[in-house]
């Protein structure tokens, strides 16, 4: 089992997602963010999950898709670094 570490940027993404959805419903904002976190938790047991991020073509930069969001992460020997939680409608530039 590997350790999953969230970057400050990824945590800020989660906060922004929560704030945006909360404008309509705090209940659904809590529920959706929990769903994203649970998806990331699966990486502890399955670190090679998801696919390579097409914009970067590097095997160690991968993504999971959850709803409209792309969870971008870096696979290292002993840990997974969650670097962004990015809406799929937005262009992914630098990470």
Regions found by a protein language model. Give the residues of each.
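Absolute protein N-terminus
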Residues: 1-2, 95
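Basic, Lys/Arg-enriched alpha-helical interface segments
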Residues: 3-57
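A short hydrophobic/aromatic micro-motif that marks alpha-helical segments and, especially, helix-coil
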Residues: 39-41, 61, 83
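Glycine-rich, flexible loop/turn motifs
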Residues: 49-52, 60, 88-91
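Short, hydrophobic/aromatic-rich segments at coil-to-beta transitions
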Residues: 57-63
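Enriched for short, Lys/Arg-rich terminal
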Residues: 66-69, 74-95
């Amino acid at each position: 089992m590997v350790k999953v570490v969230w970057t400050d940027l990824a945590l800020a993404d989660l906060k922004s997602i929560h704030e945006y959805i909360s404008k309509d419903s705090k209940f659904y904002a809590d529920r959706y963010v929990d769903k994203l976190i649970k998806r990331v938790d699966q990486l502890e047991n399955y670190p090679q999950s998801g696919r390579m991020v097409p914009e970067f073509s590097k095997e160690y930069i991968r993504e999971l898709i959850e709803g409209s969001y792309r969870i971008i992460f870096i696979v290292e020997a002993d840990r997974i670094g969650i670097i962004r939680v990015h809406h799929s409608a937005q262009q992914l530039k630098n990470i």
